[in-house]
Amino acid sequence: MQIDNLKNSKAIETLLPKYRANINDYVITLGGDKLLFTVELEGTSFTSVSDEELKTYFSSLDDFFLNLGKEYGGKLAIWTHIVKKRDELEQKYKFHSKFIQNFTDKYLSGFTNQNFFKTSYFITFVLKYNDLNDGLASCDSILAQANTLLNRYDGKLLSILDITDSVSICENNEFLSYLLNGTYQTITLNDSEVLDSVCNSDLFFNYDYFEIRNKESTISKYGTAYFLKSYPARTTLGMWDFLLELPYEFILSQSFIFTTAQKSIRAIEIQENKLSSSGDSATYQLEELEEARAYLSSGEIAFGDYQASILIFGETAKAAVDNGAKVISAFTDKGRGARWSRAAIESIYAFLSIMPDSKFRPLSSVRGSTSLVCGFSLHNYFSGKALGNPIGDGSAIMPLKTPTQGLYYLNTHYTPLKVNALGEFIAGHFLMLGATGTGKTTLEATIVAFLQRFNPQLFVMDYKRSTELYMRAYGATYFTFESGVDTGLNPFQLEEVASQDLLQFLYSWVISCSRDHNGLISDEDRMLIKEAVDAVMKLDIEERRFSMLLQVIPRSTPLYIRLRKWSHFEGGELAWIVDSPKNLFNPYDFDKIGFDTTTFLETQGHEGTEPLFSVLLYYKDLMKKSGRLLLSIVEEFYIPCSYPTTEQMIKRTLKTGRLTGEFLGLVSQSPADAIRSNIFEPIVEQTSTKIMLPNPDAEYKGSYERIGLSRKDFYLLKGLDKESRKFLVKQSGSSTLAHFDLSHCKEFLPIISGSTLGQQECEKIRSIYGDDPDIWIPLFLERMEEIKKEKAALKQNSQQNL
């Protein structure tokens, strides 16, 4: 193949349909008697949706085309396009923290020089009209009928968008331009004909390949073209879904020109005659045509002239030819018998056939509209939402890779793909479950790191100090509760003059310490508690503490007996939890704070769990500052959710947190226990995002089924190895597998994936150099690297001595 052999088709615009003008926001005029408009569809998450539901979607799409055929007959044509193109990570991430900037830069370096791909679906409607106004009304009617598709498949109408008061871009023109030029270009609304606006390349056609030389680029794009020669003998929904996994750019065009019933029957007869006289062993095709005639007569199917072409691209001529051969080979292996023919000297006509309303449609044949639906499944992999999200600047929290060479944009807030939800009060709570050793804390730390560019407040109730190192690195303060040591929590001293909100909390807080062995409390005891709290709050603020309640409650009452264990004055064994003489925490000053609650989480049924957690959650509510995001993470959340007071506090945050900008992360390494939580149903309902890490012991019935996972989701999750560094993300009805790999970020792992040794070394260094992350982090990482080398040397010496 020599470039010199290429033929220059400078006059290709003379062979293109006459795209005239943008007559309204979404319709383009064609020639003198046709109108054109396009919808873009992301598709449905077929790896998550049940097969039964996919069949329903298939039937609905089939009915949609059938009804259009009945209504418009030979006046309507449809061009569908499956477009797979390279995808790049374009978002830039800036942080104030040196550590986070360095860490995220290193993480994002894993996305450079990578081949990512994204698949999109398009349907272009070409309508012939007699009266322009009637034609436009028909376009409106077709669009109204297509609304179900737009909603189901995350679609949008390609239209004119106003960027400024004086500048508008034409999405529909840009799509035509992409088909012709092989690249997206911004096209603004102007007085030129649409055809003139979209023609921006010189095209050269060779026997084996074609070249697109864009006038605004010095880099050529190469492609090879194929016609569909033989359609599969037996079709089924999603029969070409294997294309979603192929790592090549392509445009698969399938056009369908509806015909009247009379013309369709005549066309079937002609095709029957051709098959009969050809001598080919095509008995099944003749049987299909006879069957089609019967369906056509009964109105159960719409017929038309069907044609398909595929353009496969590469960075060089050889790459294009090689990629084309691989794609066609995949059709041979998996395409249910579809036979493609390389266009060769007719490649220009294959190229032209992808343009909506092209008169060049080689190897077209009469087929039912169901055939079109089988090859245009609208199945796709869920890729998340890159822009237009509610928080920060609207960009996704962070990017992830998928096992199918795609990009996934992770968000905890879920909003429809095509809706710009920036600034809206949307629930962003998430549920994260995974067995021990699956990378849960590491993933959590990375998500929190990327969120720091939006400067959220942070509140964490931790287990085994798993978040301590990353919290301190992100500028948080962190406290550990030790058994027998005063917690420093004394809500009686929060306000000089107690607000009604504080009083109501104190009543419920003391009640949580006062229940009898059945977990109950009498109305009489409730009144005594209220009187005691009110009395304590009348004391000077420095005198207020839990023990002072017993100065008011009669000693002879059972309530007094039950409260003694919480009082230092009475030598109570649990006094260290609630009876601190001085409140050491001012929640109004909190910005980023974490508490290690291991002492309470490790002891099943610890009596201090409910009182302690309720104070912490109340302090969380008080720390929230207007206009700021607040991310609250509760590790092993099922434990606080098993107590009445804290259960209700968490439930309230789930329901109303969005109104104040709070989103809650409920995390557990014990999925079975978490799923048995008292309020698991509300948790599932209110958490818009479920992040499921591997769990080899997972069960579906009565367990992961309750999370809302489909059986397909569950089998994907169940098949993940604990060391796979993959996890499942579920949002709304869609899900995807994401790949999270920090193997190229090892120098940051001592903080992102902390250890007990790391916690100890961090304490030593901070005791000398202080808590400024910019100072202690470099010293800490250097020390951890030294320890790593020392261990390696010891291991080597021990092996040599064997």
Predicted regions and their residues:
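P-loop NTPase motor domains
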Residues: 44, 54-70, 242-244, 349-408, ...
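Hydrophobic positions on the alpha1 helix immediately C-terminal to the Walker A/P-loop
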Residues: 443
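A short helix-turn-beta junction within AAA+ P-loop NTPase domains corresponding to the substrate/partner-engaging
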Residues: 679-692
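Hydrophobic anchor at the beta1->P-loop junction of P-loop NTPases
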Residues: 432
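Phosphate-binding P-loop
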Residues: 402-403, 413, 417-427
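Conserved lysine of the Walker
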Residues: 440
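Walker A (P-loop) phosphate-binding loop of P-loop NTPases
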Residues: 437
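Extended, folded cores of ATP/NTP-driven motor/assembly subunits in large transport
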Residues: 1-384
